[in-house]
Regions:
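Acidic, Mg2+-coordinating phosphoryl-transfer loop and its flanking beta/alpha structural elements
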Residues: 124, 130-164
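Short catalytic/ligand-binding loop motif for oxyanion handling, primarily in non-cytosolic enzymes
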Residues: 38-40, 72, 81-85, 114, ...
Length: 164
């Protein structure tokens, strides 16, 4: 797994070791959908409900969701408002362990089609820190760079963190 420490620095870390390191702290883990738990290239562009589930990642996240100190969130952007309902349906079907109140799905249409990376970085700036370790898992380096730029305290992990 790869962890981004500082601008340009990369460190290999294993997710289980990482979580063990914070077993006595609250962890808020935000997980992207497209390309992380759902195959981004499979199906039609606007029919998210037809995306193929990536079961190895889903199974690992389901195990993580059972840890008492981890709050697991979906953290996804969608181009159009209708994508919100499609993603909710998909989560209900393939990853129902993501609590409905922990599903952050941001519609670009409702935000003047601002780039997903900017929307995600803005959202992360407003996440209540409350002493928790904040983690974002995403497959898009552009999103990770945008989040890092304005959220230096957030731990960024590539989607490969879910594959041992």
């Amino acid at each position: 797994m790869i962890k981004y420490k500082h601008k340009g620095d990369v460190e290999k870390v294993y997710l289980e070791d990482f979580l063990e390191q914070y077993k006595d702290k609250k962890v808020k883990m935000f997980v992207d959908m497209d390309g992380v738990i759902a195959d981004f290239n499979f199906g039609e562009a606007h029919n998210f409900d037809k995306k193929r589930p990536l079961y190895s990642s889903i199974n690992k996240l389901e195990d993580i969701s059972k840890k008492d100190n981890v709050d697991l969130y979906i953290f996804s952007a969608t181009r159009m408002k209708k994508g919100y309902d499609e993603k909710q349906y998909w989560l209900d079907k393939y990853a129902p362990f993501f609590k409905k109140e922990n599903r952050v799905i941001i519609s670009r249409e409702e935000h003047d089609f601002i780039e997903s990376a900017t929307l995600k970085a803005d959202y992360m700036r407003n996440v209540e820190r409350d002493g928790s370790v904040i983690v974002v898992i995403d497959d898009d380096p552009k999103n990770l760079r945008a989040i890092r730029k304005s959220n230096e305290d957030v731990v960024l992990l590539k989607d490969t963190a879910l594959v041992d």
